[in-house]
Swiss-Prot record:
Annotated protein name in UniProt: Chromosomal replication initiator protein DnaA
Residues covered by region (Domain III, AAA+ region): 138-360
Domain I, interacts with DnaA modulators, as annotated region: 1-71
SUPFAM superfamilies named among the record's database cross-references: P-loop containing nucleoside triphosphate hydrolases, TrpR-like
GO molecular function, one term: ATP binding
Length: 480
């Protein structure tokens, strides 16, 4: 108990030292392993995180521990062994040392947050000419790391992306790296930034960036033209494969070819980066072998931008627009109002800014009231937010201190079963999804299991006031 208290005090001081965002992103899974004589041993889930903490924060942690207990002479970081199988998402702990922006102490950071959405401003000119990818979908030069706005919702994904783009031969990799989020939150921007930065590097790697739809078209064309072997050979020799919109990969034969390509690249230690609008285990249309291989890497979810991120995106967009019209002015009050009310995605924020830009050309004095009229179709006020099952799972998992993967796993312990049943109940009451579809989103369960969970929670709510209040709280959190 004394050692637990020591760890709690050190954790609190570490959080105060590095800031809550950095602490949550990188130290959230740090645990006390043991204390023996003069040595404190802390554990983390992955080798990546162990190496990163040892290189950057071990001295600070040791100092904090010794300030709490002068008898401690040494702090060691261990990698704890998993006690149960689960899908390897591990977003917080799966990013290596290149995540410089995420680990800079708050006092050395820019006052403005730097969050990531495709609507951001113009990227800085590259230090060297960017070569073209071998083939594939076109790259947009605006979508570099410099124009990607970073914040708490995408910091881990950005750090992983930078690590891959900057990694040299033999570097530690997250393979495959799987980035998932709803539409308009910056996945495509981030993937293109990886490709652009990698192509710009002195290593001159062989890079292929393409969408799943382009992959299907290219393979179908190659098969039709009896050129499939040539296409496979060209893909075999690449160093970095980046696939966007994986949820659109359809067709048994195409998926079979992609599975072979994926296996070949991963077995050859070539880097693969994939993005989709849902987690790999939720891509029900994919061949099970493809899903399994994608789940074998690191999956990182990007969430929606907060107010500070949205405001920064609008400021950058205004700065970019001023390059064409130096006299352009949109008051900060207007930008703040838009950032506060247009909350769905970066694409909608871009649409809102374009509306302002257009209207300002013949209505130079826009008021808040006029902005509300113009952007009424983009503002969520007064309209119920469309809730996704993924949102429900995330909020419920966080509330009950379990992982989202545990909710969809086969574990039947009490600490998992009750949150799982509550999440199923909320999925039925807050979304239009059917019992079978909800069951599939919860690890492929039968519709009768979902029906039982819904009825069970309904019974408990009627008899348990505390649970009823909990459910109402969860509904509010989900709809925020």
């Amino acid at each position: 108990m004394r050692h637990d208290a020591l760890f709690e005090r050190v954790s609190a001081r570490l959080k105060a030292q590095v800031g809550p965002d950095v602490f949550a992103s990188w130290f959230g899974r740090l645990k006390l392993h043991s204390v023996s004589k003069s040595v404190v041993r802390l554990s983390v889930p992955t080798t990546f995180l162990k190496s990163w903490i040892n290189n950057r924060y071990l001295d600070l942690i040791t100092t904090l521990v010794q300030q709490e207990d002068s008898e401690i002479l040494k702090v060691e970081i261990l990698v704890r062994t998993a006690t149960r199988g689960h899908r390897p998402t591990a977003p917080e702990e799966s990013v290596a040392a290149a995540a410089e922006a995420a680990v800079v102490p708050p006092s050395r950071r820019s006052a403005a947050p730097t969050v990531a959405i495709a609507a951001a401003a113009v990227a800085a000119a590259p230090a060297r000419p960017v070569q073209a990818p071998l083939f594939g979908s076109p790259l947009d030069q605006r979508y570099g790391f410099d124009s990607f706005v970073e914040g708490s919702s995408n910091r881990v994904a950005l750090a992983a992306a930078r690590t891959i783009a900057e990694a040299g031969a033999g570097a530690v990799r997250f393979n495959p790296l799987f980035i998932h989020s709803s539409v308009g939150l910056g996945k495509t921007h981030l993937l293109q930034a990886i490709a652009l930065a990698a192509l710009q590097s002195a290593r001159a790697p062989r890079v292929v960036y393409l969408t799943a739809e382009y992959f299907m078209w290219r393979f179908a064309t190659a098969i039709r033209d009896n050129d499939a072997l040539s296409l496979k050979e060209s893909l075999r020799n690449i160093d970095l494969l980046i696939i966007d919109d994986m949820q659109f990969l359809q067709g048994k034969s195409i998926q079979h070819e992609f599975c072979h390509l994926l296996n070949m690249l991963l077995d050859s230690a070539k880097q693969v980066v994939v993005a989709a609008d849902r987690a790999p285990w939720e891509l029900e249309s994919l061949d099970s072998r493809v899903r399994s291989r994608l789940q074998g890497g690191v999956a990182i979810e990007m969430e929606g931008p907060d107010y500070e991120m949205r405001l920064e995106m609008l400021k950058r967009r205004l700065e970019a627009a001023r390059q064409d019209d130096a006299s352009l002015e949109i008051p900060l009050e207007i930008l703040s109002h838009v950032a506060r009310n247009v909350t769905a995605s970066g694409r909608e924020l871009e649409g809102a800014f374009n509306q302002l830009l257009f209207r300002r050309s013949f209505e130079p004095q826009l008021s808040i009231e006029r902005v509300d009229e113009l952007l009424g179709h983009l503002v969520n006020a007064g309209e119920p937010r469309r809730v996704r099952i993924e949102d429900i799972q995330r909020v419920v998992a966080k509330h009950y201190n379990v992982s989202r993967q545990e909710l969809v796993s086969n574990r039947r312990t009490r600490v998992i079963v009750k949150p799982r049943q509550i999440a199923m109940y909320l999925s039925k009451t807050l979304t239009p999804r059917s019992f079978p579809e909800i069951g599939r989103r919860f690890g492929g369960r039968d519709h009768t299991t979902v029906l039982h969970a819904v009825r069970k929670i309904e019974e408990l709510i009627s008899a348990d006031t505390k649970l009823s209040h909990e459910i109402e709280l969860l509904k509010r959190l989900i709809n925020e």
